[in-house]
From Swiss-Prot:
Stretches assigned to the TRAM domain: 12-70
Alphabetical UniProt keywords: 4Fe-4S, Iron, Iron-sulfur, Metal-binding, Methyltransferase, rRNA processing, S-adenosyl-L-methionine, Transferase
Positions bound to [4Fe-4S] cluster: 83, 89, 92, 171
InterPro entries in UniProt: 23S_rRNA_MeTrfase_RlmD, MeTrfase_TrmA_AS, MeTrfase_TrmA_CS, NA-bd_OB-fold, SAM-dependent_MTases_sf, TRAM_dom, U5_MeTrfase_fam
Organism placement in taxonomy: Bacteria, Pseudomonadati, Pseudomonadota, Gammaproteobacteria, Alteromonadales
Molecular functions (GO terms): 4 iron, 4 sulfur cluster binding; iron ion binding; RNA binding; rRNA (uridine-C5-)-methyltransferase activity
Residues the record marks as active site: 406 (nucleophile)
Class of the enzyme per the UniProt entry, highest EC level: transferase
Annotated source species: Shewanella putrefaciens (strain CN-32 / ATCC BAA-453)
UniProt family annotation: Belongs to the class I-like SAM-binding methyltransferase superfamily. RNA M5U methyltransferase family. RlmD subfamily.
The gene coding this protein: rlmD
Protein name: 23S rRNA (uracil(1939)-C(5))-methyltransferase RlmD
Pfam families for this protein: TRAM, tRNA_U5-meth_tr
PROSITE patterns, alphabetized: SAM_MT_RNA_M5U, TRAM, TRMA_1, TRMA_2
Domain of life: Bacteria
Length: 450
């Protein structure tokens, strides 16, 4: 028998009266933290040492969330955001804080979470890897928004915590040549007869040119292709189309893959070049990626003929430089397409001391052909971390473990596994891969002591 209940009003979502709060610190997502009636209050947009007027938007038993109404007393770290879209676009969330303040916060947050969960309090950080604060991204994916009423197509990014597309005319963290293409591309796409069926637009700046990948849901006619080809020639950019099956087709020219170099770019004999398809993952900050790889080589110190395992190796960002320095490298990656690209890159660089495998690194690894004694281990996992992979340390017994992390929480959790297995944290440093955002990347070096 069906029973019907009248839904209770959700009072937890109602706005409170305006409150004046003092902000103490930032949380790991870049929101200000204040106290109110025994609860922690999270306030996006607020900074430490500020007095702010807010309204509570959500109340739970132990915490609340608030909307920033006004800053009554400013922090000396507060600055005017440079991007006109900052308050609506969901891409950046710390443009209101000075770059030096952002980095101090990220280093403090990294130390705090490692001390809290990995018991590493009292340690000092290695110098942070830092670079340009603006126009550092070599890659971005722009969403399309087609208005059925006006028949107009807009390009933009998603709003924070939303699927809504915010139309933009520029991006202050995207490489300047790519940012300058946003308005011309929007104008071009509105001239296409297929504009209602276009998907996202990906822009890429590589060492061998600028690229645009346009997602299409149906084949374009000859007139649309001619317009794209003319645009590509005018703006000196490679354009390729990606269809529903994920296949890529060059517009006007043969398909060209973007390429970037690592190690010494001035001495070609020491450099390695990596090509990638638009579907492959690459680090978006070219300057910091080069510094990160160089630091990894310095910290791990690969020697000729050492057996080094590179887990979550991608298309060879670390594997190729390790092999270039003489090590016998085994790379393992969970995405088959990236394993294929890693093999292509190894062959293109004439590196034969490299073997790549495709496999699920969260599964039972005991019977994998590459499992066994190694000299050193490099890990570069996704945000979920490498907890499952580290359960097999006893079979691998590396003297050194270099962990490159894009999530301090999973790094701290995984560090406990290493510490329990007899490893000691020797070095820890911030990698500021994403200025103007709360995202924290880090590099940690562990050495076996038992």
């Amino acid at each position: 028998m069906a029973q019907f209940f009248k839904a209770k009003p959700n009072s937890s979502k109602q706005l409170s009266a305006k409150l004046s709060l003092n902000v103490d610190q930032l949380d790991h997502l870049g929101a200000g933290i204040a106290q109110y009636q025994g609860k922690v209050v999270f306030i996006p947009g607020a900074l430490p040492d500020e007095t702010v007027t807010v309204q509570l938007t959500e109340q739970k038993k132990n915490y609340a969330r608030a909307k920033l109404i006004k800053v009554d007393a400013q922090s000396p770290e507060r600055v005017e955001p440079e991007c006109p879209h900052y308050h609506t676009c969901g891409g950046c969330d710390l443009q209101h804080m000075s770059l030096s303040g952002q980095r101090e916060h990220k280093e403090a947050a990294l130390l705090d979470i490692m001390a809290k969960f990995a018991g590493t309090e009292g340690g000092a950080l290695s110098p942070a890897l830092t670079g340009e604060g603006w126009h550092y991204r070599r890659r971005a994916r722009l969403a399309t928004l087609f208005d059925k009423n006006t028949k107009h197509l807009s390009l933009g990014f998603r709003a924070a915590s939303s699927s809504n597309v915010v139309p933009i005319s520029q991006c202050q963290v995207l490489a300047k040549p790519l940012s300058d293409l946003i308005v011309p591309f929007a104008k071009l796409l509105n001239q296409l007869s297929a504009k209602a069926s276009l998907g996202h637009l990906e822009l890429i700046a590589a060492d061998n040119g600028h690229f645009a990948v346009l997602r299409i849901t149906k084949a374009l006619n000859d007139k649309d292709l001619a317009k794209l080809s003319a645009f590509a020639e005018q703006h000196q950019i490679y354009i390729c189309l990606q269809d529903n099956e994920g296949q890529f087709q060059g517009v006007g020219v043969e398909l060209v893959l973007p390429v970037y170099q690592l190690l010494d770019e001035n001495a070609q004999s020491d450099a390695v070049s990596l090509s990638f398809t638009p579907g492959n993952f690459v680090q978006v900050n070219s300057q910091i990626n080069k510094a990160m790889v160089a630091q990894a080589m310095d910290w791990l110190a690969p020697a000729p003929d050492e057996r080094i395992l590179d887990l979550f190796c991608g298309m060879g960002n670390f594997s190729l430089p390790l092999a270039k320095m003489g090590a016998d490298v085994i790379g393992v990656e969970g995405v088959a397409e990236m394993v294929s690209q890693a093999r292509v890159n190894a062959k293109a660089n004439n590196l034969d001391k490299l073997t790549f495998y495709h496999g699920d690194l969260s599964a039972d690894l005991s019977l994998e052909p590459w499992m066994g004694k190694i000299d050193k281990l490099l890990l570069d996992p996704a945000r979920a971390g490498a907890f499952e992979s580290l359960q097999w340390l006893k079979k691998m017994k590396p003297r050194k473990v270099l962990y490159v992390s894009c999530n301090p929480a999973s790094l701290a959790r995984d560090s406990t596994v290493l510490l329990e297995r007899g490893y000691r944290l020797q070095r820890l440093g911030l990698i500021d891969m994403f200025p103007q955002t709360h995202h924290i990347e880090a590099m940690a070096l562990f050495e076996l002591t038992k």
